[in-house]
């Protein structure tokens, strides 16, 4: 496992749709492990392959709940409902934070690292994290969805 350099905006790779993963091999497993290590090192809750310069439809998410680490390969949203607005940040946009409105519930079909399909149903913060990472796979920047920006001082004031 290795910590990789996170690509920061502006970078073309962040705005380019990623390619479908077709081979589930040791290289993919290493990519997912490197992404996970990088996410933890950077104190994130999710990371998509394009954020480390790899245009593959792969992401990892871990929000600190009992589900633990979730590898998402070739994810697609099957259903979504409800609405939530909350503050988001992104490892590819250091010190940029803002309100983003997303679905409160998503049902996602994806593949695990072995190529086995699974269904993930997520609500609240996990749904937010999954949608954020899936946007990266489509070349969509979270800044295109921000309705209100916050400074670090404003965030610190909110946290008390």
Curated annotation (Swiss-Prot):
It holds the Pfam family Pep_deformylase. The keyword Iron applies. The active site is at 133. Keywords: Hydrolase, Iron, Metal-binding, Protein biosynthesis. It catalyses: N-terminal N-formyl-L-methionyl-[peptide] + H2O = N-terminal L-methionyl-[peptide] + formate. Removes the formyl group from the N-terminal Met of newly synthesized proteins. Requires at least a dipeptide for an efficient rate of reaction. N-terminal L-methionine is a prerequisite for activity but the enzyme has broad specificity at other positions. The gene is defA. GO terms for biological process: co-translational protein modification; translation. This is Peptide deformylase 1. One of its GO terms (molecular function) is peptide deformylase activity. Its EC number is 3.5.1.88.
């Amino acid at each position: 496992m290795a910590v990789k350099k996170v690509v920061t905006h502006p970078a073309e790779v962040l705005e380019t749709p990623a390619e479908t993963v077709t081979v589930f091999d040791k290289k993919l497993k290493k990519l997912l492990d490197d992404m996970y290590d990088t996410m933890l090192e950077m104190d994130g809750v999710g990371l998509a392959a394009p954020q480390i310069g790899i245009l593959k439809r792969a992401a990892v998410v871990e929000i600190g709940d009992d589900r633990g680490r979730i590898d998402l390969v070739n994810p697609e949203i099957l259903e979504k409902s409800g609405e939530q607005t909350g503050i988001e940040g992104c490892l590819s946009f250091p010190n940029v934070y803002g309100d983003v409105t997303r679905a409160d519930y998503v049902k996602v079909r994806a593949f695990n690292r072995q190529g086995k399909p699974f269904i993930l149903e997520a609500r609240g913060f996990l749904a937010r994290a999954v949608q954020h990472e899936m946007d990266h796979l489509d070349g969509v920047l979270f800044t295109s969805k921000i309705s209100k920006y916050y400074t670090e001082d404003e965030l610190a004031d909110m946290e008390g």
